[in-house]
């Protein structure tokens, strides 16, 4: 294979999957075939999309009811020649799913890149090992927290929140994705003030925390803004990839003057991936493509919290981010939304140690504040790695958290 293989889930009311697959393969490449003269067929053969797999799936009554028609469900795979497109994500996505995304109940499930095609993508600049080296933390999941309620607040409020989270043992603190450039907490001021706070905490407590600052602005200003952030001392750039596009992420990741990790936020991605019938699968969008384009971290809804993703999908995202691939470093999985200390055993069980445990309210909502919330998570992480049930741990911060949010593996009885 020298090009790319696209895998689709289709729902066809003509009940002829083979014919539908061939129509897609032709429609996204040379347009027609049987009516072409033999000589022209020979000339265009190398550009023709090739159907390489058709698999009928069991009938799904819920889908038929939803669509108000009886359809045949199937998985099809089509190979697109590398000759047909330039080696960039806009060209790849337009070739494999451009006008097809408008044509009925079709979902792009996966894209399989040839080794030759992979050479055109950067992958993560740091990856899991590089991030761990920055923090000098190699033997446990990382803990991340989020600034909360920053809109309309000044830099003093940010510094207080940051200090409390760092003292609590949080490894990474990230901006809220809806915190944009503003007069009260401008980008460079957040970075400079944040570094002062984190250096002070490190000198006092010996704990290192990184700050992920939100990179925002117009598309053609992003590189300048990123370089300004780097010059101010930014540790990590948080980026709302799907508000801008995967190619923009790749452009940032490939720039040697932006030598910091990039954290991809999934904002807007639900518009592409939420439906079971249309769009692009979450594992492809939030896993494989983010990794290829250069994200060191990928945030996505966890299977446990307030904006839950199906467990199978969440694990598939993580698989794409962390599976061995000689072409790319591994990206950190960051299952998010509604996470509290009681979920830590499940996160470690399902995602392993190479995961970032990301919490907002589960840290800030602790009765002992963000310091207590961070300490509760760190204690839960340590206990989980020691195979110790959370309810058996003698720690006031963890017990308080379990009282408030519960312990899914063992309901706390007081």
UniProtKB/Swiss-Prot annotation:
UniProt modified residues of type N6-carboxylysine: 174
Catalytic reactions on record: 5-methylsulfanyl-2,3-dioxopentyl phosphate = 2-hydroxy-5-methylsulfanyl-3-oxopent-1-enyl phosphate
Binding-site residues, substrate: 148, 174-177, 265, 338, 360-361
Main function: Catalyzes the enolization of 2,3-diketo-5-methylthiopentyl-1-phosphate (DK-MTP-1-P) into 2-hydroxy-3-keto-5-methylthiopentenyl-1-phosphate (HK-MTPenyl-1-P).
Family that this chain belongs to: Belongs to the RuBisCO large chain family. Type IV subfamily.
NCBIfam families: PRK09549.1, salvage_mtnW
Name the UniProt record assigns to this protein: 2,3-diketo-5-methylthiopentyl-1-phosphate enolase
Lineage, opening ranks: Bacteria, Bacillati, Bacillota, Bacilli, Bacillales
Gene label: mtnW
């Amino acid at each position: 294979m020298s090009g790319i293989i696209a895998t689709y889930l289709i729902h066809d009311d003509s009940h002829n999957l083979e014919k539908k697959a061939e129509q897609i393969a032709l429609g996204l490449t040379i347009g027609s075939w049987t009516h072409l003269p033999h000589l022209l067929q020979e000339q265009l053969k190398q550009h023709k999309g090739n159907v390489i797999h058709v698999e009928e799936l069991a009938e799904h009554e819920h889908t038929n009811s939803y669509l108000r028609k009886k359809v045949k469900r199937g998985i099809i795979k089509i190979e697109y020649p590398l000759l047909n497109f330039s080696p960039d994500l806009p060209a790849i996505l337009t070739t494999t799913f451009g006008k097809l995304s408008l044509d009925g109940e079709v979902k792009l499930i996966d894209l399989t890149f040839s080794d030759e095609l992979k050479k055109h993508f950067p992958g993560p600049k740091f990856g899991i090992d590089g991030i761990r080296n920055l923090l000098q933390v190699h033997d446990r999941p990382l803990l991340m927290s989020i600034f909360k309620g920053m809109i309309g607040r000044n830099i003093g409020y940010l510094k207080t929140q940051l200090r409390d989270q760092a003292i609590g043992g949080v490894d990474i603190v990230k901006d809220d994705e809806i915190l944009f450039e503003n007069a009260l907490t401008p980008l460079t001021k957040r970075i400079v003030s944040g570094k002062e706070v984190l250096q002070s905490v490190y000198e006092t407590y010996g704990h290192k925390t990184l700050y992920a600052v939100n990179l925002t602005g117009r598309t053609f200003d992003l590189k300048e803004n990123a370089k300004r952030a780097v010059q101010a001392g930014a540790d990590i750039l948080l980026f709302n990839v799907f508000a801008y596009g995967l190619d923009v992420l790749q452009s940032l990741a490939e720039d040697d003057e932006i030598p910091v990790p990039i954290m991809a936020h999934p904002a807007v991605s639900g518009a592409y991936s939420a439906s079971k019938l249309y769009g692009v699968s979450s594992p492809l969008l939030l896993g494989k493509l983010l990794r290829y384009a250069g994200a060191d971290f990928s945030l996505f809804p966890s299977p446990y919290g307030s904006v839950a993703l199906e467990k199978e999908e969440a694990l598939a995202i993580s698989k794409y981010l962390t599976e061995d691939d000689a072409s790319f470093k591994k990206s950190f999985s960051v299952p998010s939304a509604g996470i509290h200390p009681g979920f830590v055993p499940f996160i470690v069980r399902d995602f392993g140690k190479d995961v970032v445990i990301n919490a907002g309210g589960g840290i800030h909502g602790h009765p002992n504040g963000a310091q207590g919330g961070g300490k509760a998570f760190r204690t839960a992480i340590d206990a989980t790695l020691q195979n110790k049930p959370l309810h058996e741990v003698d720690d006031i911060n963890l017990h308080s958290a379990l009282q408030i949010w519960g312990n899914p593996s063992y309901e706390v009885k007081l």
